[in-house]
């Protein structure tokens, strides 16, 4: 049996880039909660003792940007300079302007257009992907890397591993076999975890705790054997972390946010963007389309692409590829996708309820992936029953 290795990485919520994603989405939540028509393009950057929020926001909401920044940093665990950032004493800069009137008239006619007339907020192309190798219909390498990152945070916050600090990265290499286009995971080849830690803990304690409290609960035993390679804090020391260790920026972790290197990516980031930005809403609807195709049994693996022009409601193109796993030809599946999914931005907002913010809805998406999550707020993960004319035998 011929096999190959494929690797996906993740970072947890204390990574500086992910901190920025979460702040940008916390701002989006606050705007949408008070004004569902808010137009938000919110970027964040951070370095030692500094967080800056900047971008274009047009909203009726009254938003305390500085409070959102400090609350988000505090909730992640950035409560002192020792751990990489002090939420209560760091410098917070805010540079927010209104959305360009040129963009506003072209996209939503200054809020005069009906939902089906609303144009895409920008040009671009987005991809959705699904595979039957896990219950989430997501790639196993990505699922495991993401869950390891989430588990690192869990054992830090619940006190199981008190030596942990907020910043951390994970990476999982899986050995796969290609079954006529479908991906079959054979075993986990390599597990890599680099996590920030305090001054007192030894490397042996780190390795022992990570194996016992992080890896064991996350990776099913059937995927591990005596040949599995573990790299646990291979650099030997990771005390300085968070924004003190590295600068952070919104939109720098787009592969971690999506499919871990599987499928494809159009390049547009998600966090801090309202649903008229098709970078986000377009990627969400094509994930729902790909997932629904695989869940319905029409294919074992599927990628869907959609593309847009600024100000134009209808997509320019829709593409489907099932990697040879389709039960019917791809052109038939493409027809089914077009008949069952409305790719116009205004209609995607309605059908996926994307104007509803608050309650940390979009903040939740900004760490541990936007897809494959079992949470009612992730409306794009709901499998849509597909209506189509089955060919007569």
Swiss-Prot record:
Which key words tag this protein in UniProt? ATP-binding, Cobalt, Cytoplasm, Magnesium, Metal-binding, Nucleotide-binding, One-carbon metabolism, Potassium, Transferase
> Which Pfam families does UniProt cross-reference here?
S-AdoMet_synt_C, S-AdoMet_synt_M, S-AdoMet_synt_N
On cofactor binding, the record's note says: Binds 2 divalent ions per subunit. The metal ions interact primarily with the substrate. Can utilize magnesium, manganese or cobalt (in vitro). Binds 1 potassium ion per subunit. The potassium ion interacts primarily with the substrate.
**Protein EC:** 2.5.1.6
Listed binding positions for Mg(2+) are: 9
- Broadest EC class? transferase
- For binding L-methionine, which residues are annotated in this chain's numbering? 56, 99, 246, 277
InterPro entries named among the record's database cross-references: ADOMET_SYNTHASE_CS, S-AdoMet_synt_C, S-AdoMet_synt_central, S-AdoMet_synt_N, S-AdoMet_synthetase, S-AdoMet_synthetase_sfam
Q: Where does this one sit in the cell?
A: Cytoplasm
* Entry binding sites for K(+): 43
A single Gene Ontology MF term assigned here is:
metal ion binding
The cofactor(s) it depends on are: Mn(2+); Mg(2+); Co(2+); K(+)
Q: Which GO terms describe its biological process?
A: one-carbon metabolic process; S-adenosylmethionine biosynthetic process
By its UniProt entry, which Gene3D superfamilies does this protein fall under?
3.30.300.10
The family database entries (SUPFAM superfamilies) matched by this protein are listed as: S-adenosylmethionine synthetase
Sorted alphabetically, the Gene Ontology cellular component annotations on this record are: cytosol
Binding residues annotated for ATP, in chain numbering:
15, 167-169, 235-238, 246, 252-253, 269, 273, 277
Q: In which pathway does it act?
A: Amino-acid biosynthesis; S-adenosyl-L-methionine biosynthesis; S-adenosyl-L-methionine from L-methionine: step 1/1
Reaction(s) catalyzed by this protein?
A: L-methionine + ATP + H2O = S-adenosyl-L-methionine + phosphate + diphosphate
**Belongs to which family?**
Belongs to the AdoMet synthase family.
Summarize subunit and interaction data from the UniProt record for this chain.
Homotetramer.
Q: Which NCBIfam families did the record assign?
A: metK
Q: What does this protein do?
A: Catalyzes the formation of S-adenosylmethionine from methionine and ATP. The reaction comprises two steps that are both catalyzed by the same enzyme: formation of S-adenosylmethionine (AdoMet) and triphosphate, and subsequent hydrolysis of the triphosphate.
| Name of the protein in its database record | S-adenosylmethionine synthase 1
Which organism is the protein's source?
A: Solanum tuberosum (Potato)
């Amino acid at each position: 049996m011929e096999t190959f290795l494929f690797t996906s990485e993740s970072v947890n919520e204390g990574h500086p880039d992910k901190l920025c994603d979460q702040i940008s989405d916390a701002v989006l939540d606050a705007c949408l909660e008070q004004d569902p028509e808010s137009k938000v393009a919110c970027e964040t950057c951070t370095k030692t003792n500094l967080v800056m929020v900047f971008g274009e926001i047009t909203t009726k909401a009254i938003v305390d940007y500085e409070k959102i920044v400090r609350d988000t940093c505090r909730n992640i665990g950035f409560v002192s300079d020792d751990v990489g950032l002090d939420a209560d004493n760091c410098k917070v800069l805010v540079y927010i302007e209104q959305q360009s009137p040129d963009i506003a008239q072209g996209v939503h006619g200054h809020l005069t257009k009906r939902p089906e007339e609303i144009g895409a907020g920008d040009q671009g192309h987005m991809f959705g992907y699904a595979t039957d190798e896990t219950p989430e219909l997501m790639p196993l390498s990505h699922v495991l890397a993401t869950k390891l990152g989430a588990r690192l945070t869990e054992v830090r916050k619940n006190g199981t591993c008190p030596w942990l600090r907020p910043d951390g990265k994970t990476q999982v290499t899986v050995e796969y076999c290609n079954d006529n286009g479908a991906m079959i995971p054979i075993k986990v080849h390599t597990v890599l975890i680099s996590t920030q830690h305090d001054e007192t803990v030894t490397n042996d304690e780190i390795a022992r705790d990570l194996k016992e409290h992080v890896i064991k609960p996350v990776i099913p035993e059937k995927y591990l054997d005596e040949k599995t390679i573990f790299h646990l804090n291979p650099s030997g020391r990771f005390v300085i972390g968070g924004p003190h260790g590295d600068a952070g920026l919104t939109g720098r972790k787009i592969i971690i946010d999506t499919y871990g290197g599987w499928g494809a990516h159009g390049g547009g980031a998600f966090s801090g963007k309202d649903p008229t930005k098709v970078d986000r809403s377009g990627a969400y609807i094509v994930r729902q389309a790909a997932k629904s195709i695989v869940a319905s049994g029409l294919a074992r693996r599927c990628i869907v692409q959609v593309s847009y022009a600024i100000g134009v409601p209808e997509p320019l193109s829709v593409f489907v590829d099932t990697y040879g796993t389709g039960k019917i030809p791809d052109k038939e599946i493409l027809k089914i996708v077009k008949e069952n999914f409305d790719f116009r931005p205004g209609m995607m907002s309605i059908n996926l309820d994307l104007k509803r913010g608050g309650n940390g809805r979009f903040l939740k998406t900004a760490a541990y992936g936007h897809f494959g999550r079992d949470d009612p707020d992730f409306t794009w993960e709901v499998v849509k029953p597909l209506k189509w004319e089955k060919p007569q035998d």
